[in-house]
Amino acid sequence: MHFPAVLLLFLALFPTVLTQTVEHAELLIETTARISDTDANYICATLDWWPHEKCNYNQCPWGSSSVLNLDLSHPFLAKAIQAFEHLRLRLGGSLQDQVLYDVGNLKTPCHPFRKQKDGLFGFSNGCLPMDRWDKLNSFFKRTGGLVTFGLNALHGRQKIKKQWRGNWQSSNAHDFINYTISKGYEIDSWEFGNELCGTGVGASVDAELYAKDMIRLKSLIDQLYKDVHPKPLLLAPGGFYDKVWFEKFLDVSGPTTVNALTHHIYNLGPGSDHNLISKILNPKYLDKISYTFRNLTQTIQANGPWASAWIGESGGAYNSGGRNVSNTFVNSFWYVDQLGMAAKYKTKVYCRQTLIGGNYGLLDTNTFIPNPDYYSALLWHRLMGRGVLDVNSNGSPYLRSYAHCTKERAGVTLLLINLSNQTEFSVGVKSTTSISLHASAKAQHKKRSFLHGLKQTVSWVGSKASDAPLSREEYHLTPEDGNLQSRSALLNGRPLQLSKTGDIPSFSPVLEDVSSPVSIAPLSIKFIVFPNFIAPGCREV
């Protein structure tokens, strides 16, 4: 590597050596109305089917993280899930359309996946034994997981070139779902197929055929769950957005079939790309995916307003993620920006690839210790409520901002992301409510003292003005030692580390005077909670 390239990489990874500048910015939060609402369990993580033989770019990062062999007894795993109270877990992935279920009249032996040169994705069919399914459900019940299970949508079809034709054979899925119901296992949602829409990835199915088989699956679920409440949701197609395919699918399946359209996001490209970090820190690059969100929203509004949008799988970089990138602090800039952007575009659920496995796991594949993105996800889950508010900024594109109603209490939570490696931003925060309140107060109380007028000016952070100082809560995420590729994150300067028994550390905020500007350092992330922010749009969320 030439010296200039080495220097640029060094400066990107260790930004503290640069001379910092301070830039002022103003944010206006629209608090009178919400622009969208997420599901109460917006944060979701996936468990995949890949065996340890899954390799990319001369590395094999999956270990024993599969649905079939993950160590469910590991205390770190249980505590990581329980910290979310009810973490949504999506079981699926590339190999799900090769999974058979060892129940009923299955006529083939129940063998695990094995390498097969002419197999889909280089693997043979695999099988889920019911004793493993029993153990998984015991684990989900113990940890409070909300389960989305991806069904095999290729069973019974025939491959003709890349496209798969013929009707879906539903008998194995029928027996599996029936077994699941008989055991009292609660499934939040069933998903049909993985990355079979449009041109597909390893395989594809025509939209009309797919929709007709979805109608059959819906009928099957209605029949099997006729005496069970609540009835699980039905999701599809679990693939990359294709306008024509999605429109046809919605038109043929009709308004009573699918509850949510699931789509996948891997907008950073292959995990082998040496430019992953520069993509993550480039606001123009991050903005590109907004067109997909916008177009899907329009497709649903025009063709299937009964359905909601879910991101069923998103890992940033595909093919197992980027080594020493996807599992480090720098990836959190991409991840939290995705969470904010997706919510703005009416996404109800966001499933991160993966909870564990590959380079992009929220947990380390071998040690089960949380990577930085885990803590970003948990902070989001605990602070950002369902209601999404619009934010207008006059600042640099390197300052990203998102606002939600604060979770389970009054107020508003603001997320700031500083992508600049040199600029500290000093941010003034106002709201549409504060402006109207101030104007009204000025008109009605012209003769009041300056001090009382000042209290009225800042009354947007509380329902009543008082002599007591008003504070906001700040949760500031930075990388350990200023190294963007650190596997450790700091919260307000303190390392986020598990206890010896795997307990998740507490999140203690720094309290700041609410009337002072919000400061955010270069290459850092900050959640700011305004506890008593007057936000009419947050009522009844």
Named regions from a protein language model:
Residues 2-260, 290-312, 316-541:
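Non-catalytic accessory regions flanking glycosidase/transglycosidase catalytic cores in CAZymes
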